[in-house]
Amino acid sequence: MPIAATFEIEYLQYLDADGKLVRDDLPAFARDVKQLVELYKLMLFVRVFDGKAIALQRTGKLGTYASCLGHEAAHVAIGSAMQEDDVFAPMYREYGAQFYRGVKPREVLLYWGGDERGNDFSGPAHDFAWCVPIATQCMHAAGAALAFKVRKEPRVAVTVVGDGGSSKGDFNGAINVAGAM
């Protein structure tokens, strides 16, 4: 059979499948073992919290609950990369980022238990509340970023969207707003 194409994809790898270093030029954050351990502890906490919340939901003790299973590392990384005065416009399952930024587990449970006071969380007051409708948080982040640009503030607005959100009008509108800035 004839070959239509061959190609190689370059990638950057620091650990092999056994967790052993394959490079010596680690980024600065990865050389801080204490910080890495703290981030890992938070990832583990998020995994355990998520499991407990799912159990509460499955037994009728908690309302709708959006699991974050498998997203722990990505969400903790988002929280750890942000500065305190940056703005986070979460979707509805970025607990790792929110815990890193000061939101309390009790507040998450309050919200998903039907008590809107859970949205009055302990994290930065300028972070947005959870958005359950798909992709609506994208416009919030784009608007905050535009305000930072107009005011010449060295801040960022961060949001997260899933695969389904990229087909929504709010996602596309936010991309247009961001591109026009």
Please identify what each model-predicted range represents.
Residues Q13-K20, K41-I54:
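N-terminal glycine-rich anion-binding loops that anchor highly charged ligand groups
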Residues R23-K41:
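N-terminal cap/recognition module
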Residues A5-E8, L36-E38, A81-Q83:
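A generic structural signal for short, non-catalytic loop/turn and secondary-structure boundary residues
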Residues V33, L42, W130-I134:
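Short acidic-aromatic active-site loops that bind/stabilize oxyanions
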Residues M1-A28:
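Charged, compositionally biased N-terminal leader segments and the immediate start
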Residues R31-K34, L44, L69, Y100:
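Residue-level detector of secondary-structure boundary/capping sites
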